[in-house]
């Protein structure tokens, strides 16, 4: 039985968020094809994720003990470590990821838990795990010059790669706010892509 961590980074409801419309469909299909897997939903806004304080930073860099697994910040890093698969439902906001997702990433990118330092430098500890990022965008960022502006999916792929996650896929619904676009068709195509990836994820 695999453990999937479903991370939601949008204050909108499942019905009003275009990202969540796609991600919820992904999860629905995933459940159908992986009925024995455990799915843990982590809504970052409901969790009350905040920016790290000086005290938090001190705790993160302190030696890890058995009690660290129950620390209010470090518990998220251990939860991330224990999962086998990750689904990130996070829209693009102003070319990047929502700030709350960046704050969460600061919670989980912890030396001694999700990566470690060696004589050769940093080494990720999440080898063999896989992730998918589901993202809706108002504009189009697949081709130049706008592809250079895209710093949401690229960042997420990079930081997860730093932690050892090499199997990374992306499902995007782009051009949703461009005048004249068929939004229903764009979302429909994204739902179909999500369905196919969910079956084999």
Swiss-Prot record:
GO terms for molecular function: electron transfer activity; FMN binding; oxidoreductase activity, acting on NAD(P)H as acceptor; oxidoreductase activity, acting on NAD(P)H, quinone or similar compound as acceptor. Its cofactor is FMN. The keyword Iron-sulfur does not apply. Keywords: Flavoprotein, FMN, NAD, Oxidoreductase. It comes from the Bacteria. InterPro entries: Flavodoxin_fold, Flavoprotein-like_sf, FMN-dep_NADH:Q_OxRdtase_AzoR1, NADH:quinone_OxRdtase_FMN_depd. It catalyses: 2 a quinone + NADH + H(+) = 2 a 1,4-benzosemiquinone + NAD(+); N,N-dimethyl-1,4-phenylenediamine + anthranilate + 2 NAD(+) = 2-(4-dimethylaminophenyl)diazenylbenzoate + 2 NADH + 2 H(+). Binds 1 FMN per subunit. It holds the Pfam family Flavodoxin_2. FMN binds at residues 92-95. It is an enzyme of class 1 (oxidoreductase). Its EC number is 1.6.5.-, 1.7.1.17. Homodimer. Belongs to the azoreductase type 1 family. HAMAP family: Azoreductase_type1. Quinone reductase that provides resistance to thiol-specific stress caused by electrophilic quinones. Also exhibits azoreductase activity. Catalyzes the reductive cleavage of the azo bond in aromatic azo compounds to the corresponding amines. This is FMN-dependent NADH:quinone oxidoreductase. It comes from Caldicellulosiruptor saccharolyticus (strain ATCC 43494 / DSM 8903 / Tp8T 6331).
């Amino acid at each position: 039985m695999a453990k999937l961590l479903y991370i939601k980074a949008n204050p909108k409801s499942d019905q009003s968020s275009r990202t969540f419309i796609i991600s919820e469909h992904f999860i629905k299909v995933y459940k159908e094809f992986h009925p024995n897997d455990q799915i843990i939903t982590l809504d970052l806004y409901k969790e009350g994720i905040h920016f790290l304080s000086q005290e938090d930073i001190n705790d993160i860099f302190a030696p890890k003990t058995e009690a660290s697994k129950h620390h209010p910040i470090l518990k998220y890093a251990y939860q991330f470590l224990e999962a086998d698969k990750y689904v990130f439902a996070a829209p693009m906001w102003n070319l990047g990821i929502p700030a709350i997702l960046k704050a969460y990433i600061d919670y989980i990118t912890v030396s001694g838990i999700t990566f470690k330092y060696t004589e050769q430098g940093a080494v990720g500890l999440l080898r063999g795990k896989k992730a998918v990022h589901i993202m809706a965008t108002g504009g189009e960022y697949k081709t130049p010059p706008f592809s250079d502006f895209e710093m949401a999916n690229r960042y997420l792929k990079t930081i997860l790669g730093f932690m050892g996650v090499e199997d990374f896929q992306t499902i995007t619904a782009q051009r949703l706010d461009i005048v004249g676009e068929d939004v229903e068709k764009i979302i429909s195509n994204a739902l179909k892509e999500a369905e196919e990836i969910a079956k084999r994820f």
